[in-house]
């Protein structure tokens, strides 16, 4: 055994091999895969990829959450090289950029990506492509035939790059965050101090697997604690599915918890019933939930555990303990990290900085950005303004970032964010960055109240551009559901 992940795979195969583990909806019902079947497929798919020459290569995974994604993620990370997750909702330009940036040699893709994949194949004819629907089972079978037996492959070292996660920057192209297996497994003990999860628990997995929290804390840590996972379908089916599978663990963003709250009031059905009737642990990240909604869950005995972290900290920084009544905090600092507040003001607020096994290896092929992300004492600079009191973490907002244009003009990202937010009441968050000479924004909106007509958005941005300086005019914008607003 050369890494902690392989150790858990071996233990799980012995302890839980015959147990149902992953459930994915096929037609109208959830179909199970056992721990043994999953771990065997991981080994044989890794065998196939190594046989095809992908050792220590970057391999992309593109599509919605699926069991094939999970098999690929673990196989690549543990035995092959560096897995790179692509968001299923990315635009063609974002996928092209990410393929080039991460230097992938192979792309595992879902046929549901349709037209974008047709264009990608033409743009990158030299990549190896593996279709989830058409090729994946055959690849596993080929690996099985070539294998000398289960667990005969050598696991990769725990301290080398194993995972690339793209995180949206506020002033530039998305950065490619490099994580090792040791990074990925740095937080399970802190999570275990907060929850008593085990084989009797069920996680309803909604968060996308290309994000660190969904991938690490919902999926990968199931290999530590042994709980079952049901893959969520569409948002509109969530309540129906939860009432059918009765989960005990669920992680979401404020938009989802707000929708359940509103549905509960409108239908006159208790929140606990909508969430399946036996929910134990709710985790909320991405932004703070309002005290009113958080209290509504608490009144039914479901305590919302706020979580705060970044991709660069392997989604580990702070998580509430169950029953926490401090509505303003974003969680209790992990016990296994060294965090501090830099240059605090009179109220104790400054930039949050952190050291620990959770802190990433660096940005892929970007030494300058990596160097800028740390101070002279080796602390990672989060860019978030906050404070820590009695091990509770509080966030005030992002540190204002200055954007330097190609003509040398210096403008405030925060000022632009605030002005864009004023354009429409449905806007919940804005990210500002440069692409070439264009000032770009990702505009995260509440789906229920956001304009559906692209022409209306175009008109709103045109009106904004008329009243700002020529240096602050938006050159390109993307309208994105706030359900995608994860770090």
Label every PLM stretch briefly.
Residues 114-158, 264-271, 480-481:
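ANL superfamily adenylate-forming
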Residues 32-36, 162-188:
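Conserved AMP-binding A3 loop
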Residues 21-53, 60-66, 70, 74, ...:
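Conserved AMP-binding/adenylate-forming core of the ANL superfamily
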Residues 18-20, 144-166, 173, 196-202:
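Conserved pre-ATP/AMP-binding loop-to-beta segment of ANL
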Residues 185-202, 209-278:
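Conserved AMP-binding/adenylation subdomain of ANL enzymes
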Residues 248-252, 260-326:
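Gly/Ser/Thr-rich phosphate-binding loop
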Residues 332-333, 345-373, 392, 407-411:
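Conserved ATP/PPi-binding loop(s) of AMP-dependent carboxylate-activating enzymes
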Residues 107, 356, 362, 385-472:
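AMP-binding/adenylate-forming catalytic core of the ANL superfamily
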């Amino acid at each position: 055994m050369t890494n902690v992940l392989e150790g858990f795979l071996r233990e799980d195969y012995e302890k839980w091999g015959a147990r149902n583990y992953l459930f994915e909806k096929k037609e109208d019902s959830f179909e199970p895969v056992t721990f043994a079947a999953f771990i065997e497929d991981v080994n044989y798919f890794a065998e196939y990829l190594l046989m095809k020459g992908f050792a220590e290569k970057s391999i992309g995974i593109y599509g919605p959450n699926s069991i094939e994604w999970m098999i690929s993620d673990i196989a690549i990370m543990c035995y092959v090289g560096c897995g790179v997750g692509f968001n299923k909702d990315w635009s063609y330009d974002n996928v092209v950029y990410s393929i080039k940036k991460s230097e992938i040699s192979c792309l595992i893709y879902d046929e549901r990506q349709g037209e974008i994949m047709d264009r990608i194949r033409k743009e990158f004819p030299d990549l190896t492509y593996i279709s989830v629907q058409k090729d994946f089972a055959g690849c596993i079978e080929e690996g099985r035939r070539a294998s000398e037996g289960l667990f005969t492959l050598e696991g990769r070292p725990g301290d080398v790059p194993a995972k690339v996660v793209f995180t949206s920057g506020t002033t530039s192209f998305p950065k490619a965050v490099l994580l090792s297996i040791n990074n990925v497994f740095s937080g399970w003990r802190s999570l275990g101090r907060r929850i008593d999860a085990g084989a009797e628990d069920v996680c309803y997995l909604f968060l996308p697997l290309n994000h660190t929290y969904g991938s690490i804390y919902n999926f990968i840590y199931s290999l530590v604690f042994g709980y079952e996972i049901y893959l969520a379908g569409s948002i509109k089916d969530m309540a129906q599915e939860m009432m059918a599978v009765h989960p005990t663990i669920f992680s979401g963003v404020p938009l989802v918890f707000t929708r359940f709250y509103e549905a509960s009031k409108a239908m006159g059905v208790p929140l606990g019933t909508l969430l399946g009737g036996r929910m134990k642990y709710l985790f909320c990240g991405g932004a703070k939930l309002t005290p009113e909604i958080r209290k509504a869950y608490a009144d039914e005995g479901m305590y919302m555990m706020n979580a705060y972290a970044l991709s660069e900290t392997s989604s580990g920084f702070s998580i509430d303990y169950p029953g926490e009544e401090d509505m303003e905090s974003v969680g209790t600092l992990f016990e296994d990290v060294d965090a501090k507040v830099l240059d605090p003001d009179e109220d104790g607020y400054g930039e949050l900085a952190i050291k620990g096994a959770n802190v990433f290896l660096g940005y892929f092929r970007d030494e300058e950005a990596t160097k800028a992300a740390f101070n002279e004492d080796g602390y990672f600079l989060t860019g978030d303004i906050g404070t820590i009191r009695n091990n509770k973490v509080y966030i005030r907002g992002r540190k204002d970032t200055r954007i330097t244009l190609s003509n040398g003009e210096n403008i405030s990202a925060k000022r632009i964010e605030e002005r864009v937010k004023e354009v429409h009441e449905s806007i919940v968050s804005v990210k500002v960055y440069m692409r070439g000479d264009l000032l770009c924004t990702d505009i995260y909106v509440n789906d229920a109240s956001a304009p559906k007509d692209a022409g209306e958005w175009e008109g709103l941005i045109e009106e904004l551009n008329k009243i700002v300086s020529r240096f602050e005019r938006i050159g390109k914008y993307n309208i994105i559901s706030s359900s995608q607003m994860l770090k």
